[in-house]
Each structure stands twice: as C-alpha cells, then as structure tokens.
Amino acid sequence: MSRAVGIDLGTTNSVVSVLEGGEPTVIANAEGFRTTPSVVAFTKDGEVLVGETAKRQAVTNVDRTLSSVKRHMGTDWKTQEIDGKKYTAQEISARILQKLKRDAEQYLGDTVTDAVITVPAYFNDAERQATKEAGEIAGLNVLRIINEPTAAALAYGLDKGKEDELILVFDLGGGTFDVSLLEVGKDDDFSTIQVRATAGDNRLGGDDWDQRIVEWLIKRFKESTGVDASTDKIAKQRLKEAAEQAKKELSSSMSTSIQLPYLSLTENGPANLDETLTRAQFEQMTSDLLDRTKKPFKDVIKEAGIEVSDIAHVVLVGGSTRMPAVSELVKQETGGQEPNKGVNPDEVVAVGAALQAGVLKGERKDVLLIDVTPLSLGIETKGGIMTKLIERNTAIPTKRSETFTTADDNQPSVAIQVFQGEREFTRDNKPLGTFELTGIAPAPRGIPQVEVTFDIDANGIVHVSAKDKGTGKEQSMTITGGSSLPKDDIERMVREAEEHAAEDKKRRESAETRNQAEQLVYSIEKLIKDNEEKLPEDIKNEVQGDVDALKAALAGEDDEAVKTAYDKLNESQQKLGQAIYSAAQAAEAPAAAAGEEASAPSSSTGEEDVIDAEVVEDEEKKQQ
C-alpha cells in the first residue's frame, strides 16, 4: 500500500514527515540530515543536484544554482537559460519535492504517492495553485494544501491538555512571515483546530536578515580595499553563505568573526575580508525588519476580537525565530509570555502536515482541521468597484452566491472579473481571472438576473461560476496558475487598504455618484421620450438642458461638477412630474387613470438611488 507524507516546502529548507503507528516521524535525507536545503543546481555535465550537495557547490556554479525559489511561486518568473531551457518556479520546486519523495521512499521501503504540502497562510490563490502544480510535476497526488501555522498548531496542540485553548503561531521562515491565532477545542477523544485569524508578509524572512549582513560586509570591504564585491557573482555567493553562518552564530554568541580569504583581487594582490560583527550591531541594522512583524501580530489580535491575555500558548515556527531579538519581541508583544520552546521550529510544520495526511487517509480519526481564506474575494462591478462575496478569514471550505444585473439595455453578455484583496477598487487588488457569460436574453438594464457563485475548496483554491437565471446558461472557471498575471505583495494590499481608507472611500463615493448620475440621465431621457406630447416645450427644453449639462459633466473628470449637475437635474425633474400630473388632471377620467400609470415610474425614477450591479439576492452557504 502506498504511503502519504507531510511536506514543509520551505524557502530555505524543506522537511518531510510520515505517520508510523499513528505518530509522526521526521525522515532524514540521504545525506543524514533532517532538513533539506531548498537548493537546486544544474552541473555543466548535465547532472541535477538537490539539497545539501547543490548548496555545497554553489560558489563554483553560481549561475546554475537556484535557491529561495518559493518567493517566485505564482508569478511568471523563469530561470535564465540553462542548457537551452528556462525553468519555472514550479519546475524547480518539483525537483525539491522529488528529492523528498525519494528520501521518504528509501526510508519506508515503500512507494510514496500522496502528500499534504504546506504553504504560508498568506499565500494567495496563484501561489497555492503553483504549489499544487509543483507537487503534481514531482509525481505526487496532493491530498491537501494547508497553511503552515495551522500545521504547526496541529502538531503542537494535540499534545496539550483537554481544555479549549487559544494558540498563537508566530512563523518567521527564510522568505515568508505569518502570524495566526488558532482555537483548539477538545473533548475526551476528539480535537477540533480552527483558525480564528491570520495575517502576514510574503516578502519578509531570514533571507532579508542575511542580506543586511551582506550589504554591511560589501560596504566594509570596499572601505578597506577599494574593491566593490557586489559586482562579482562568486564573491557575492561567498558573502551570502558567510552572512547566513554569522546570523546563526549570533543567536548563541554576542559576536562573530567573518573571515573570507582571497575574496577578490587588487593591484597589490589578493584582498581578504576579516570583520567582527556583534549581536548589537546586527540587531541595529535589522531593527526595521523586526518592526515589520509587529503590525500583522496586532492585526490578528484585533481581527479575532481577543485580548493578548487570552492566549494560552505561543509557538515559534521557522528557523529565523531562533534569533534572540525575535523571541524577545514576541515575548514583549504577548505581555511577557514566554514562547514555547518544546517544539523544533524547523520540523513542527512538516509534523503537522503528516498528521493531516493521516487524517485524510483515515489513519487518524481524532482531529478536525478548519482553516480560513487569508484575503477577501469578489468581482468588479460598474465603476471599478470591488464587490466582495467572501470576506477574509472566512472558514473554508465555503460557498457564497449573490445575484447581479446588467448595466446597459439589451446587454448580450457580462464579463465576470475575479479579484482578491482588501481595497475598495479592483485596480488596487490582485486579478485572479476573467470569464464571460454570453447569451443573455435581450432586456432593459436592471432586468436580467445573473447569479455569481464563489466556491473555495479545502485547499483554498477558488472556483467561480455565473448563471443567467432567465436562460439557464452557465459559465464557470477554476482560478489556475496566475503565472501570466503581475505579482503583487499581498501584505501591501491589506496595509494600503488601511492607510488609504479615506482616499478609497472618496473614490468609491465618486464612482457611486457617477453611477447614479448615469442612471438619472437614462431615466429622465426615457421619461421625456415617453411623454413628449404631454410636456410643455419650455419645461422639456429646461430639463433636457440639465440632462445635457450632466452628460457633459460625466464626460469630464471633475467630480464636483458631476455632483452639481446631478443635484440640479434631480431638482428640475420634478417639473416633469408636475407637468405630466397637470395634463392628467385636465384629461378625462380614463385618460387620468392612464396618466397616473405613466406618472408612477417618474416618481420612482426620480427618488430612487439605483446603483448598477446592485445585489438583489443574497444566499450564503457555508460548508464546515
């Protein structure tokens, strides 16, 4: 029988774990280490090296050695040409997964086909899909994509007591950062782990701390020798490796010596680097990176609606949390609570993934995992407005439907444009994809009903469908790849959503005013046309003049001019109603009755604020 494993596919290191007798075991690789560097190298004789062997030869093969590829997942990034081929992030990640798969098979003496792979909680849809594709390229059946902090809580939470508890997971890896708050509910023989809130930064990790040391060393080397090492690829690789080692040493020592003989050549001969870096210097040069971890932490506490004192356990995940400044900051932010030191920050995520694999394969039946979607999902409606159907931190899997309408008369189709993010306007959010629902029956604007349904599966991958209720025609798509879309920083979306809240509100109000103005122009022109014979020429000309003025304002960029013209037309349109009513009073009773029917839509049109793409039906289904 084939086995299922749990894999932590990390930016700098990866780990594989398996359940044996219901208990997780971390599998050592062929080189004897429990973590495998996420490094892939192509040698000049055509061999592909992965892990420790690839990392060791990086200095002599800089251009053909690839690391930190996880930062490119879900983008259109490709390697430079290697032996006539350019590789995607998925293909390079697949090489790492293949290595982990082989090591697991060698350890188990059995084939491995199924895997649960972890991703940062703040990975968007394209990044998750790319991770799943990498697994498939590696020959794995990806049972589930789960969030790294959730996996850590799963591994940590099940060993604790029987009471319900809140666990905060602070996950600072090599390239990504997440904070998650999870609730562990227990009874005698069953545990439920539910994610309450999550936040993070997909462009913050240990690599950034290493880079600060590299920059400092380049500067010091130039000051002492006059040589700019940043232009030498081999020198930069040596500096990068030295910086990583120095960072690790400063976690247990107050200072470290960095010595790189023959780093470069000058007119006077070889130039050596010999520097001493203290922990205080290191913490000073990286203080702004540490500060960037504070906001996601505060966001999670606020989002979950709890006090810091409600947190029962703090779990540190990721090798970067070994830095004393990081654990000290976590202690300060949690009101002096000591972070738990009982878990291995490098291995706990893979252990949780193995547990989840066991649950999905039926080997463990005592736990239920409930995850959340990290960002809001919605579609673009008229004016470029982001209409959210699923809010961030909604439990998944989930399904949500809303009904929209058309913006123009006899509109034959609607384009469903799907976005992910927190801003009020779609242009500030990440596009996930577009599809078109065609064959809508001809009808005036506002009459057709198009039901849009968002369905997020347990992997956090989005499926969207649209159905014309009139004709029954339906179109759907699964958001895949995202490789052709520009890559936006997800944390930036949430941060800017708060920073630009006032600006967004003003822009949204402007868009809504323009929508209302267009609707008013449409309805007044229709009213004039339908009642042309009943309206006195002077009133008709006056109102038509106001209509033309509003149309001219709409053609320009001045929002105040639109509002002024809108208010004037809104006022003058009442004269139309009075004129039609007077004509009706003067006519005979049957005519009067007909006149009242004609006047009914006029008052409705004049007083209602109708917004295109208005939601007319709301139906929510959530699957737990």
Swiss-Prot record:
PROSITE patterns for this protein: HSP70_1, HSP70_2, HSP70_3
Originating species: Leifsonia xyli subsp. xyli (strain CTCB07)
Chain residue ranges for the region called Disordered: 496-515, 583-624
Keywords: ATP-binding, Chaperone, Nucleotide-binding, Phosphoprotein, Stress response
Compositionally biased spans, kind Basic and acidic residues: 496-512
Name recorded for this polypeptide: Chaperone protein DnaK
Molecular functions (GO terms): ATP binding; ATP-dependent protein folding chaperone; unfolded protein binding
A Pfam family it matches: HSP70
HAMAP family: DnaK (MF_00332)
Inducing stimuli: By stress conditions e.g. heat shock.
Keyword Magnesium: no
Bias-annotated ranges (Low complexity): 583-605
Protein's UniProt keywords contain Phosphoprotein: yes
Modified residues (Phosphothreonine): T176
Function: Acts as a chaperone.
Residue stretches of biased makeup (Acidic residues): 606-618
